[in-house]
Amino acid sequence: MRSAPVAALLLAALLTPLAGCARTGDEPAGPGPAALPAVEVVLTKSGGIAGLSDTVTVRPDGRWTKVDRSGVSRSGQLTAADLDRLRQLAADPRLAAEATATVPPTMCADAFSYRLLVGQTTTSYVDCPPQATPPAATHAVVDLLTRATG
């Protein structure tokens, strides 16, 4: 009869380290941001009265480089939160839909044009508020990168 308590004690000792691996039910289902595919993202902003031409390239690990029209380069690293958000936006199915949408030509003078390359998907828009609303997913990436890279 002594073997039953010993076996129970042994089983408890073996399973205790695994208790930390159990899900609590409070965690969201599905892949987290780290599980999303990491792709290179390139944003080009051009136009405006001064003839701006800036290109931001973000590597899959969040390192970025920004080059202006004169060739001056700056670099940095996205925060973990910004990188997670960028990965979520890069996986957004709206980007593919926005890439195939037909956009009428704009009549705005001196407006900024944005061209976004996310992996193999290219989207673009002209920031001309009275004529058109920017595509939502593309605009979200543009806003994120503009804020994060200065």
Protein language model regions, located:
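Bacterial Sec-type N-terminal signal peptides, specifically the leucine/valine-rich hydrophobic h-region
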Residues: 15-18
